[in-house]
């Protein structure tokens, strides 16, 4: 199959079946496509849609982002995970204001210098918003290429990645680049999926090596799954009426800049902290433990509830410590486990 036929098959499929009504495809701009592409780096389209709508409603442009606080951005990102993405958006908005007078740049060399943006994301932003000729190589596109060309190897292998870039550069059409890129992403997301691909309806099936061999599972090679390490954390839930004591996390490992319950590596540390705050440890209530899965470890969370009859001098608010009100919540970023606990209190589970 020639490069032209490959791209034409993808374009024909896109015109008939491609996604054309996603929120970021309507009245699209460099800004809206940028936000969507950052969200989609680690998130499915289905999960990203409500967050995107809410984000654009609150931050319709670069200026509104610059006029906000990081806490406001993290608040709207809460629950989506991978919070560095939100921080990078906020940092980028400040850079764009300073270097480009608040206008999102339309030069590849400028876009790729923004935090959290690599070659593929920069190409996606320019091709999808302005139809500029820039190939993309996200996870969906990589999967299509290794199966179609029968390329054996790990996707993280730099030699494999270089080979895939050479291929996608050669088959991406100069005209209709945006539609081709969207078509490739859509085929990867809906047909050439990781498990049990729908090869019978794929527009590229006739010359796809994986389909001819009937061995789609061979491509790409999978990393040997490692058992994720287990970690334990103790949350101290300080509650006064409808208010909960939260502090901004400063640790580098997880949830930096998000507001959390006081957390400790073991129960002994937690009890020492309570004694320092003159809290009777006999009033502690053990809540139901649960776990939260990260990409690199599993965190077992043991919450301990303390109901305060009054607010003591140890719990005074400042910009890093607040009483979070369940009925009138402040606009701050919350990790998903903290959200989960607060939601359960809202439902009167505890």
Curated annotation (Swiss-Prot):
This is Adenine DNA glycosylase. It comes from Buchnera aphidicola subsp. Acyrthosiphon pisum (strain APS) (Acyrthosiphon pisum symbiotic bacterium). The active site is at residue 37. It holds the Pfam family NUDIX_4. It catalyses: Hydrolyzes free adenine bases from 7,8-dihydro-8-oxoguanine:adenine mismatched double-stranded DNA, leaving an apurinic site. Binds 1 [4Fe-4S] cluster. The cluster does not appear to play a role in catalysis, but is probably involved in the proper positioning of the enzyme along the DNA strand. The gene is mutY. It comes from the Bacteria. PANTHER family: ADENINE DNA GLYCOSYLASE. Coiled coil: none annotated.
